[in-house]
């Protein structure tokens, strides 16, 4: 009986082991791969997200987070996702790191982003990566060199993301070998000049911010699954091809900041699926297709500012350049268009012959020039015997106005600055150091704010918190009056994700909770995660004697133009533009380097709980709200100049404005006495005078005479140029001014 019981127990144990072995193998990574992961930690120089790894770490049981995710199957790592927050390059070689990655032979997903990785991708390493790899993301690092042609050996790849690195030159001529590829993101490199052949299954293509210099290739029309195409910030030339608007699935088309000429095709009206079309900052001429003024296209966002379109009589006409500018630039763009690569021996010979002819021509021309110079020198010597000194006197004319035109529409106008007005400052400034925009889980935000504890609340509906990665943030809680349709919310979140700029307290991400998700909030509640700036506001600096001394005139001009560029981005850098922002010195934040960060600006969302709109009042137009923002900027500028804190529309502000107007008409010493004593000796009088004059223009009671935000930026650039040309009698502020302007 006892022997029988032992046999049964042994059988049971054996069966139990058979069932448990697969489970154990999935929960415990192979020891060799554990050592590989620890070596990867070492090669990455122990980033914060990996600091908890030790010899005893069970890698398959690490809780997934937005910055770290490891998935195991049958004892092998199938996914490794590590997201750091490094903004500078790590020292040392990373060849060993890439070699270690080849030892994870079952990887399907590999993502190493913002980790400071540098060096180049070795072709041998690429060929030895896991053959089952489906997703490769090495974005936001410092990887340089060419993208190896061997990349096409990764036949199962569905997503290839190499954006924001330092890759340069030609991409592999033919990426069609990646037959399963659906996402290709090579933005933010120096690739070019020609677009490689693309695989047919692509749904998302981003080649933005590179050095592509060709016409938009016809091969794109064969990408029938394409939903998003971003070719912005390159040097694409020629006209916008009509075939782009016949791609059946295309929803987002970004062609802005190129050298595209001609007119916008009428066929762009026939593509009802395109939600966003951005052709701004090009060389387009002619008229807009009439459909864009039709109500049937009200759900479509079309951006076309800073071209040379004929929009006479429309509010958008002021955002267009002169026709002559586009014609001149288009002819130059055609002249520098690269010669296509030779496809056979005959074309190679022709190209070589052309090069030889050009060289011979240059040599002959140089010889003629040398001969002419020798003749001229000989004649000059013969004249110098009679007149040994030849003097040329040139007088520098000073452009200064003795009369002050208060509330004129321009100050230090375009006549003073013809060059600065030709190509406006790009409004899409790179935001260095920000983590990628993402959707947060509600649990993450509860953890960051200690369950939205009252101690974390430092302003109405605004909580201070800290993400798991150690990044300090603010979380704004917005309760909507009623539930919105998912499609409507998705479109609003798309706009929200664009609110990232050097001079804004940028949005890092969001979370949406419904009644079921979070029982504290009825209906939809939106949680907006933004940067946290701890250094203080402009008001703090102007009201603190010690901090105030830091703000000399060059620093104040940098702050002024920073505020202006932030407003310009809100008005013109996103679609639709954001107007009626709560602009005051309390909301102008300054970081450790005195870089401006505007907070409290309007968040474009539906009506919020507690927000009532009077029925009797007519809604204000965007133009009215734009001019209101300019007025509020004028108030900020007034306070920057004088160092005095005044409220908009107050009697103190009116009195201060009147004193400055009188100071402009009086002796220079009178106006100088009205400036903040803290800036004494650090400014050029002409810079002070034009800044005061422009501040008064912004404060005109007649809003039609207030300048546009574009004029604000241009005129502030003029005052900075004036300051750059001034040499102080004591101390050297020129170098700081140069750094500010650049």
UniProtKB/Swiss-Prot annotation:
GO terms for cellular component: membrane. Residues 376-742 are cytoplasmic. Residues 1-25 form the signal peptide. LRR repeats lie at residues 74-96, 104-128, 130-154, 156-177, 178-204, 206-223, 224-247, 249-271, 273-294. Its EC number is 2.7.11.1. SMART domains: LRR_TYP. Pfam families: LRR_8, PK_Tyr_Ser-Thr. Residues 406-417 have a biased composition (Polar residues). Keywords: ATP-binding, Glycoprotein, Kinase, Leucine-rich repeat, Membrane, Nucleotide-binding, Receptor, Repeat, Serine/threonine-protein kinase, Signal, Transferase, Transmembrane, Transmembrane helix. It is a single-pass type I membrane protein. It catalyses: L-seryl-[protein] + ATP = O-phospho-L-seryl-[protein] + ADP + H(+); L-threonyl-[protein] + ATP = O-phospho-L-threonyl-[protein] + ADP + H(+). Residues 26-354 are extracellular. Belongs to the protein kinase superfamily. Ser/Thr protein kinase family. This is Probable LRR receptor-like serine/threonine-protein kinase At2g02780. It comes from Arabidopsis thaliana (Mouse-ear cress). The lineage of its organism: Eukaryota, Viridiplantae, Streptophyta, Embryophyta, Tracheophyta.
């Amino acid at each position: 009986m006892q022997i029988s019981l032992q046999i049964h127990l042994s059988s049971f144990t054996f069966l139990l082991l058979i069932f448990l072995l697969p489970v154990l193998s999935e929960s415990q990574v192979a020891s060799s791969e554990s050592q590989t992961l620890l070596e990867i930690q070492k090669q990455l120089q122990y980033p914060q997200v990996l600091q908890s790894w030790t010899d005893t770490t069970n890698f398959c049981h690490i809780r997934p987070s937005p910055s770290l995710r490891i998935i195991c199957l049958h004892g092998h790592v199938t996914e490794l996702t590590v997201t750091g927050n490094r903004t500078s390059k790590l020292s040392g070689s990373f060849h060993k790191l890439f070699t270690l990655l080849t030892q994870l032979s079952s990887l399907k997903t590999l993502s190493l982003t913002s980790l400071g990785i540098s060096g180049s991708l070795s072709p041998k390493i690429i060929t030895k990566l896991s053959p089952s790899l489906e997703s490769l993301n090495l974005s936001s690092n410092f990887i340089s060199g060419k993208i190896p042609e061997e990349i096409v050996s990764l036949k199962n790849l569905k997503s290839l993301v190499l954006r924001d690195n330092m890759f340069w030159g030609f991409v592999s001529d033919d990426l069609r070998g990646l037959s399963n590829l659906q996402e290709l993101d090579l933005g933010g490199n120096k690739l070019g000049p020609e677009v490689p052949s693309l695989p047919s299954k692509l749904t998302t293509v981003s080649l933005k911010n590179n050095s592509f210099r060709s016409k938009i290739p016809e091969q794109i029309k064969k990408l029938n699954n394409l939903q998003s195409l971003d070719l912005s910030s390159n040097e694409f030339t020629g006209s916008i091809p009509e075939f782009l608007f016949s791609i059946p699935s295309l929803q987002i088309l970004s062609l802005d900041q190129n050298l595209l000429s001609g007119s916008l095709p009428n066929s762009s009206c026939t593509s009802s699926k395109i939600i966003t079309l951005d052709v701004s900052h090009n060389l387009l001429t002619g008229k807009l297709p009439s459909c864009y003024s039709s109500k049937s296209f009200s759900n479509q966002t079309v951006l076309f500012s800073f071209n040379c379109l004929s929009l006479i009589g429309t509010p958008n006409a002021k955002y267009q350049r002169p026709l002559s500018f586009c014609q001149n630039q288009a002819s130059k763009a055609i002249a520098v268009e690269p010669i296509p690569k030779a496809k056979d021996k005959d074309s190679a010979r022709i190209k070589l012959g052309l090069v030889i002819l050009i060289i011979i021509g240059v040599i002959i021309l140089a010889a003629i020039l040398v001969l002419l110079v020798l003749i001229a020198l000989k004649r000059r010597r013969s004249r110098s015997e009679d007149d040994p000194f030849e003097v040329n006197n040139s007088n520098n004319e000073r452009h200064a106005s003795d009369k002050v035109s208060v509330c004129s529409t321009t100050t230090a106008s375009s006549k003073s600055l013809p060059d600065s007005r030709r190509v406006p400052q790009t409004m899409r400034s790179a935001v260095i150091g920000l983590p990628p925009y993402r959707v947060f889980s509600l649990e993450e935000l509860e953890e960051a704010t200690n369950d939205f504890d009252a101690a974390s609340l430092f302003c109405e509906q605004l909580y201070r918190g800290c993400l798991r990665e150690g990044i300090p943030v603010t979380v704004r809680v917005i309760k909507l009056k009623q539930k919105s349709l998912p499609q409507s919310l998705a479109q609003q979140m798309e706009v929200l994700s664009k609110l990232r700029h050097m001079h804004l307290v940028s949005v890092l991400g969001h979370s949406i909770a419904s009644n079921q998700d979070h029982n504290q909030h009825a209906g939809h509640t939106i949680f907006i995660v933004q940067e946290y700036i701890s250094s203080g506001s402009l008001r703090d600096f102007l009201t603190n004697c010690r901090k105030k001394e830091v703000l000399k005139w060059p620093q104040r001009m940098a702050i002024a133009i920073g505020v202006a560029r932030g407003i310009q981005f809100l008005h013109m850098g996103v679609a639709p533009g954001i107007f009626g922002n709560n602009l005051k010195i309390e909301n102008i934040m300054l970081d450790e380097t005195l870089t401006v960060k505007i907070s409290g600006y309007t968040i474009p969302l539906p009506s919020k709980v507690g927000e009532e709109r009077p029925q009797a009042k007519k809604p204000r137009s965007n133009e009215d709200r734009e001019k209101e923002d300019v007025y509020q900027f004028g108030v900020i500028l007034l306070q920057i100049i004088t160092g005095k804190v005044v409220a908009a529309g107050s009697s103190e502000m009116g009195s201060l404005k009147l004193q400055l107007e009188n100071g402009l008409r009086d002796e220079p010493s009178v106006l100088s006495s009205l400036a903040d004593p803290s800036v004494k000796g650090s400014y050029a009088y002409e810079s002070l005078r034009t800044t005061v004059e422009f501040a008064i223009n912004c404060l005109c009671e007649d809003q039609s005479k207030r300048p546009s935000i574009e004029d604000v930026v241009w005129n502030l650039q003029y005052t900075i140029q004036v300051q750059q040309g001034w040499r102080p009698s004591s101390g050297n502020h020129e170098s700081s001014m140069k750094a500010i302007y650049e």
